[in-house]
Amino acid sequence: MNMAESHLDPSKLATGPAGAGAATGQRPLAPLNAKIEVKNLNFFYNQFHALKNINLSIPEGKVTAFIGPSGCGKSTLLRTFNKMYALYPEQRAEGEIVMDGENLLQSKLDISLLRARIGMVFQKPTPFPMSIYDNIAFGVKMFERLTRSEMDDRVEWALTKAALWNEVKDKLSQSGYGLSGGQQQRLCIARGIAIRPEVLLLDEPCSALDPISTGRIEELIAELKSDYTVVIVTHNMQQAARCSDYTAYMYLGELIEFGETEKIFIKPARKETEDYITGRFG
């Protein structure tokens, strides 16, 4: 890409189903099957303006990756989707995050129900201090009344979906703390999908794992997109290229470019994106 390409007509900067509205000043085109639509989103930590006029559409049934240097706002953006910031009164979001026609930022929305619809897995594995079985059953009991047989089936289903069942089926009564780091992360994924969310958020799920465990998580992500809309934050650009269908590049709280992952990595529309991907920046 030559220097002239960084000064293209803004209307031609979209590289996929949604362009970089923050970079062009225009509302990106929404994909026909958008699961989540972010409209003019701004986020503040007290007076610090962390996200600036983000416009973005998350395609349904796909894996979308957020990439960018540390502090660019990618994890902050991810956590607005299920209102993780609601625990902290000094943090606030303005704008719209729309899913199924409903603005998720509305204060009257039940937080527990929202987080049942939009599950989340964090950077560090966080098993509950209880048995493997109860780690899975705990969240389910909050939203459904199942018989013991039905719960057994749900636990097996979730652990199977997370590619963990065969490794733990004979020790379900044992503590989740006894599992390896990679197994604990898959347990957390199983716990997240056990309540059957529509969207699964993954905040750097492999950063604390060894290469073998990372490979298994990446394989799992590829399988999960057949049932869920997946959004992943990663510092690992190779991981984004391997796992995602769409990629958003962020810098200093702004969305610089968004599009199909292959196009973002092979022929980005913005020079800033190219500089980051090729290692000349960040």
From Swiss-Prot:
It catalyses: phosphate(out) + ATP + H2O = ADP + 2 phosphate(in) + H(+). ATP binds at residues 68-75. One of its GO terms (biological process) is phosphate ion transmembrane transport. Keywords: ATP-binding, Cell inner membrane, Cell membrane, Membrane, Nucleotide-binding, Phosphate transport, Translocase, Transport. Its EC number is 7.3.2.1. Residues 1-24 are annotated as: Disordered. It is found in: Cell inner membrane. Gene3D superfamilies: P-loop containing nucleotide triphosphate hydrolases. One of its GO terms (molecular function) is ATP binding. It comes from the Bacteria. Residues 14-24 have a biased composition (Low complexity). It is an enzyme of class 7 (translocase). SMART domains: AAA. Residues 36-277 form the ABC transporter domain. It is a peripheral membrane protein. Residues 1-10 have a biased composition (Basic and acidic residues). InterPro entries: AAA+_ATPase, ABC_transporter-like_ATP-bd, ABC_transporter-like_CS, P-loop_NTPase, PstB-like. It holds the Pfam family ABC_tran. GO terms for cellular component: plasma membrane. Belongs to the ABC transporter superfamily. Phosphate importer (TC 3.A.1.7) family. Part of the ABC transporter complex PstSACB involved in phosphate import. Responsible for energy coupling to the transport system. NCBIfam families: 3a0107s01c2 (TIGR00972). The complex is composed of two ATP-binding proteins (PstB), two transmembrane proteins (PstC and PstA) and a solute-binding protein (PstS). This is Phosphate import ATP-binding protein PstB. It comes from Burkholderia thailandensis (strain ATCC 700388 / DSM 13276 / CCUG 48851 / CIP 106301 / E264).
